[in-house]
């Protein structure tokens, strides 16, 4: 799993640099980034007719889990009906779903991920010690 790409996609700086975003441009951005990460996919939709919604999924084979990044883009003009060319706010609401827990920032997600990695390492070391005893 490429954490640098996930960090970039969830950074405010990355999205602030984008201008004149609409669903078509958003799809292009996520299409490019899904090509950079193995085992990833995404879907876009008009959520309740009020938001452009993107769900970006990344499979982590090492930890045998999924990370889901959820993005909601609000239209610049809330009265305008959404279509593929409706301009949206470049700063989305972002949520990261990992092991059934929702994180609102990359930093809190990364802490949970590191804790999970450390626990996996401890478990593997314990198994290795048990296997060595069997020799």
Residue ranges with predicted function:
Residues 2-3, 39, 61, 133:
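Residue-level signal for functionally critical sites in structured catalytic/ligand-binding pockets
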């Amino acid at each position: 799993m490429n954490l640098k790409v996930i960090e970039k996609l969830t950074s405010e700086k990355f999205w602030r640099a984008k201008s004149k975003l609409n669903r078509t441009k958003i799809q292009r951005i996520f299409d490019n980034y899904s090509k950079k990460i193995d085992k990833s996919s995404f879907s876009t939709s008009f959520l309740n007719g009020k938001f452009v919604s993107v769900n970006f999924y990344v499979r982590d084979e090492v930890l045998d889990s999924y990370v889901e990044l959820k993005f909601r883009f609000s239209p610049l003009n809330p009265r305008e009906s959404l279509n593929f060319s409706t301009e949206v706010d470049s700063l989305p609401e972002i949520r990261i779903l990992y092991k059934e827990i929702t994180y609102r920032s990359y930093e809190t997600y990364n802490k949970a991920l590191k804790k999970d990695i450390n626990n996996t390492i401890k478990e593997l070391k314990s198994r290795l010690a048990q296997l060595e005893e069997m020799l």
